[in-house]
Design a protein with these regions (language model features):
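Transmembrane beta-barrel domains of outer membrane proteins
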Residues: 10, 58, 78, 118, ...
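Transmembrane beta-barrel strands of outer-membrane/channel proteins
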Residues: 23, 148-154, 173-179
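Extracytoplasmic beta-strand/coil segments of soluble accessory domains associated
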Residues: 47, 56-93
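Residues that define the transmembrane beta-barrel architecture of outer-membrane proteins
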Residues: 53, 128-130, 153-157
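A beta-strand signature from Gram-negative outer-membrane beta-barrel systems
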Residues: 7, 62, 106-147, 160
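Short, acidic, small-residue-rich periplasmic hinge/interaction motif at the N-terminus
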Residues: 2-48, 56, 82
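Short acidic/polar hinge/loop motifs at secondary-structure boundaries
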Residues: 46-48, 92-119
C-alpha cells in the first residue's frame, strides 16, 4: 500500500448573483459611467488610518489597487507594476510621485481637488501605459481672497498660498517637504 492518498473532487457549479456597488461609505468617492472612480479631495475627510486626504493613500482603499511595499508611490493597479501606471497632474505626465523613500506623496491635498482613476480600459487619449491611469486635477478656481496654510507632522511639512491677482487671474503656490535630510536621515 502506498503512503500517499489520492483524493478526487467532483465539480459543482454554482451561479451567484451580481453585486453592483452604487455608493461608498465615505463621501467623495464615486463610480463613473466610463468605468473610472472619482476621488474628490475637497468633499471628504481623511479615510480611517490616514492623516490627510491624500490621493495615493485613498486610492489604495479601492478594489484592485494595492502596494506591495507599503509605500505611497509604488501603487499597483490590477497586478501591474508601478511603471505601468500613467500618473497625470493637470495633464502633465509624472514619473516620480513620492519622496522620503516613496513613503510620502508629492501632492499637497490643499491644492488638489480630485482624481479620476481608471483600473484598465482607459480612453485612448491616455495611451502609453497598460495597467491604469491616475488623473489628478489641481485647483482651477480663482481665489476670492488671499489665504494659505501650513501643515506639519512627524515626517513632512507642507504649505500653500492662494492669492487673487484680478477677477480672472490668481495664483496658487504649494510646497511639500520631508525631513529625511535633517539629522542625517537622507
Amino acid at each position: 500500500p502506498s503512503a500517499c492518498k489520492n483524493f478526487f473532487l467532483n465539480p459543482k457549479i454554482e451561479s451567484l448573483r451580481e453585486v453592483i456597488v452604487k455608493s461608498y461609505l465615505i463621501e467623495g468617492i464615486d463610480k463613473n459611467k466610463d468605468g473610472s472612480v472619482s476621488l474628490s479631495v475637497t468633499e471628504r475627510s481623511p479615510l480611517p488610518g490616514n492623516v490627510e486626504p491624500d490621493v495615493f493613500q485613498s486610492a489604495q482603499w479601492l478594489p484592485g489597487i494595492t502596494t506591495v511595499n507599503e509605500t505611497v508611490s509604488d501603487i499597483q493597479i490590477r497586478g501591474g507594476s508601478p511603471d505601468q501606471n500613467l500618473v497625470l497632474f493637470d495633464g502633465i505626465k509624472l514619473y516620480n510621485t513620492g519622496h522620503f523613500f516613496g513613503m510620502l506623496s508629492i501632492f499637497n491635498p490643499n491644492v488638489t481637488t480630485d482624481a479620476k482613476i481608471f483600473k484598465g480600459g482607459a480612453s485612448p487619449e491616455f495611451g502609453d501605459r497598460i495597467s491604469g491611469v491616475i488623473d489628478i486635477s489641481g485647483e482651477t478656481q480663482v481665489p476670492l481672497k488671499a489665504n494659505g496654510g501650513i501643515g506639519l507632522n512627524g515626517t513632512q511639512a507642507d504649505a500653500y498660498i492662494k492669492v487673487p491677482v484680478g477677477e480672472k487671474v490668481g495664483f496658487v503656490v504649494s510646497a511639500r517637504r520631508s525631513y529625511a535630510d535633517i539629522g542625517g536621515l537622507g
